[in-house]
Design a protein with these regions (language model features):
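Class I S-adenosyl-L-methionine-dependent methyltransferase catalytic core
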Residues: 1-158
Length: 158
């Protein structure tokens, strides 16, 4: 992945980063804090990673026992990096978790709804100034993406 750097998972594993201006990776401090808060919910969870960038949050979830990660981003470089990172982490798990990446325009994709098993945790880290929070949260709520006990975590500018 030209132009990309490397990230590290909390366990030390190195991951690829898309680099450039296509993604803003979640800092290791924020990742650790979020994962510590979500720890009781991660084992066997279904994780939806919206605006996934490098896929590092999905990788953290996999490393902590998620059984399924779906990473969604509209940038092709981010999807390539995310797919590579998720595959590397999933390969170390047995039984192998389900991983999937989707290159999609987020709002229209979410508005189509979801016909499969809902997600337990949604992690949403959009570009801060693109007005995605409200329409995406509404689409998540209306589109069978969530169940009664689902958690939605939104990263935003401090």
């Amino acid at each position: 992945m030209s132009g990309g750097g490397q990230l590290r998972l909390s366990g030390g594993r190195r991951l690829l980063s898309p680099g450039g201006r296509t993604a803003r990776p979640t800092t290791s401090r924020v990742r650790e804090a979020v994962m510590n808060i979500l720890a009781p919910h991660l084992q066997d969870c279904r994780w939806l990673d919206l605006c996934s960038g490098s896929g590092v949050m999905g990788c953290e979830a996999l490393q902590r026992g998620a059984r399924c990660v779906l990473a969604v981003d509209q940038d092709p470089q981010c999807i390539r990096v995310s797919r590579s990172n998720l595959s590397a982490v999933a390969a170390s798990r047995s039984p192998a978790p389900e991983i999937r990446t989707e290159r999609r325009e987020l709002i229209s994709w979410l508005r189509k709804g979801w016909s499969q098993e809902p997600f337990d945790i949604v992690y949403f880290d959009p570009p801060y100034d693109q007005g995605l929070y409200e329409p995406c949260l509404i689409a998540l709520a209306k589109g069978n993406w969530l169940h009664q006990d689902s958690l939605v975590v939104c990263e935003h500018r401090s």
